[in-house]
Amino acid sequence: MHSSALLCCLVLLTGVRASPGQGTQSENSCTRFPGNLPHMLRDLRDAFSRVKTFFQMKDQLDNILLKESLLEDFKGYLGCQALSEMIQFYLEEVMPQAENHDPDIKEHVNSLGENLKTLRLRLRRCHRFLPCENKSKAVEQVMNAFSKLQEKGVYKAMSEFDIFINYIEAYMTMKIQN
């Protein structure tokens, strides 16, 4: 097991373990979540930094996949659904394809995906951060544009992963302040 994956697992286990007499694991995990969020975002950014240059060098397109409308959805009433759908999109569509583009980056993309899965798990445990059902038009537009780009879509989506992390941060900051 690689050190970043091991560290991620340790952070998750530490945040989930409840102290005796202090409520459920979920409750304790949720009270610590706002404090752990900066570390989780840093882990995502660190993992992305290992593949960023590769994908940005391969991304020859001038258009933007993750547009401002997606950030607006993250900040609006569809924020929960937009975040949930985008995490699912990256985990199920983008990253599996990205892993197959070069054996040298497969491990790093996998590590990035594991960090994103850990974030999703923590968000799901804390229902106030992900209590949603509606569909986001901005996410639908991202997915349609990604599909139209075919193989180049992977480069585009992965090269913009840092924008996605910033949008996650904006959403979570807004939710923590409310």
From Swiss-Prot:
Which positions make up the signal peptide? 1-18
Which residues carry a glycan? Answer: N134
Query: Is Disulfide bond one of the keywords?
Result: yes
What Gene3D superfamilies is this protein classified in? 1.20.1250.10
Q: Which SMART domains match?
A: IL10 (SM00188)
Q: Give the InterPro entries listed for this entry.
A: 4_helix_cytokine-like_core (IPR009079), IL-10 (IPR000098), IL-10/19/20/24/26 (IPR020443), IL-10_CS (IPR020423)
An MF annotation (GO) of this entry: cytokine activity
What domain of life?
Eukaryota
- Pfam families hit by this protein: IL10
Q: Which GO terms describe its biological process?
A: immune response; negative regulation of B cell proliferation; negative regulation of cytokine production involved in immune response; negative regulation of inflammatory response; negative regulation of interleukin-6 production; negative regulation of membrane protein ectodomain proteolysis; positive regulation of B cell apoptotic process; positive regulation of cytokine production
Keyword vocabulary terms for this entry = Cytokine, Disulfide bond, Glycoprotein, Secreted, Signal
Q: List the disulfide bonds.
A: C30-C126, C80-C132
> What GO cellular component term, any one, is given?
extracellular space
Subcellular location(s): the record lists: Secreted
Looking at the keywords, is Ribosomal protein present?
Answer: no
Tell me its family: Belongs to the IL-10 family.
How is the subunit organization of this protein annotated in UniProt? Homodimer. Interacts with IL10RA and IL10RB.
Biological role = Major immune regulatory cytokine that acts on many cells of the immune system where it has profound anti-inflammatory functions, limiting excessive tissue disruption caused by inflammation. Mechanistically, IL10 binds to its heterotetrameric receptor comprising IL10RA and IL10RB leading to JAK1 and STAT2-mediated phosphorylation of STAT3. In turn, STAT3 translocates to the nucleus where it drives expression of anti-inflammatory mediators.
Q: Supply the name of the protein.
A: Interleukin-10
Query: What species was this sequence derived from?
Result: Macaca nemestrina (Pig-tailed macaque)
